[in-house]
């Protein structure tokens, strides 16, 4: 139906234009025929002026009608068969692309995880929305602010993405404050990140002498080592370590430099906004504190009550942790150990820095006046399964910084505390650093910095729970969290990770126990079609095995008596 409507629209416009041309032709004849008589007749002259004004108006209308006709033709022309209807790239974008263009865009999307086809066609100096609070105003220029080194980390990033990041930094950072931009290439293989990138660097430096530098790793060393390389190469008072897939917003640097000038021990995170991976639209994110869960995945925390009490939207936000982007006093960051070079690839390194900063004399803040737009990826081509490196790095953080609370990390990943089967590397130098800096305990951190991090006390065992009657199925939370638990084929992922505390069981052997309440036991019974379901029933002697234990349980006299009573 829609194509026929567009055809009707075009025909109607053509008819209107033809009619207007006929009227214009008639008026021109009228003008020619009466040109002599109008000289002697002022009234006739005024009438003709009115007619000619209308003629000019008709001329303008014709132009607009022709434009509409052209747009309608273009609209009809832009309808193409969608080759990749299931691709995330084409859910909101790309319906006007020809089929060969769709193929190019889709292949680039699979390679990079974002829309390189569009990025290559956007201006490098595009304008993005100023997302700061209206209450923020730029104070008079402070020439005494510290200087800034900006480090951009990349590995096989799209060239146009890197160039747009560089351009935004140059255009939106005062030149007297921006000392250098350091690119760190973690062993990229893309050809355009070699000669072509070098040519662009040369071009930038022709306009801004010596501003850009590049460091190239001779092997893949990972995100953390790339950041350390950038820090080592920096020479300004303050260093900003950023991803290369960002665009800084207006006046992003001055509030950070001013805050670090006030307190060199504060490590700053700007507020992230989101650049959508498909259409590159900017989505404004709310200001939030940075936190983490016990698996050390990053998350946003609500703003603390004391921040609201200030009634100042521009005030720094006290934050338990930090995301990947950070700005710090270069020397102070070195004094507390920069980053943990033993981290692999991705994940956990930001949480480690947050813990170390707080426990060793520094602090983390989010600064609402500083905004950076961060390009999201639909997928990470370089690491399809992020959990492998995050899990390994999380254990490393737990062993160095979390003291008696480390079991919570092992519980979150469903790993035994003893012999987890994962090599998290040598941590002796990091433990020595902690001792040298006289750092506070993790208990202090929980109580004074991150009380929202929920601790499960008195845990004696955790993991999957199997009934001795049928050991290939486990207790599962069910299809929806909070739903009625079910028995399901064992897979050991989070819906099946249980935990038990000192008084929630009856010990019968090191790992076999009853679960009971009011003299009834949690057991399984065979259901229809040879499946099993959970029931509370009179104890029949079934036992449960739980995967990992933290300590000896020991029998209690009271529980012995209750269980013996339940058997009669």
Which stretches of residues belong to each language-model region?
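N-terminal signal-anchor transmembrane helix specifying type II single-pass membrane topology
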Residues: 1-63
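Cell-envelope/extracellular polymer assembly enzymes that use nucleotide-activated donors
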Residues: 146-151, 180, 352
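Acidic donor-binding segment of Leloir-type glycosyltransferases
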Residues: 170-216
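Glycine-rich, basic loop-to-helix element that forms the pyrophosphate-binding segment
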Residues: 217-234
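A recurrent flexible, glycine/aromatic-enriched loop bordering the glycosyltransferase active site
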Residues: 224, 299-331
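Short aromatic/hydrophobic "clamp" motif used to bind/position activated sugar donors
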Residues: 239
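Conserved donor NDP-sugar-binding/catalytic core segment of glycosyltransferases
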Residues: 247, 251-300, 363, 369
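Lectin-like carbohydrate-binding module/patch detector with strong preference for beta-trefoil
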Residues: 445-568
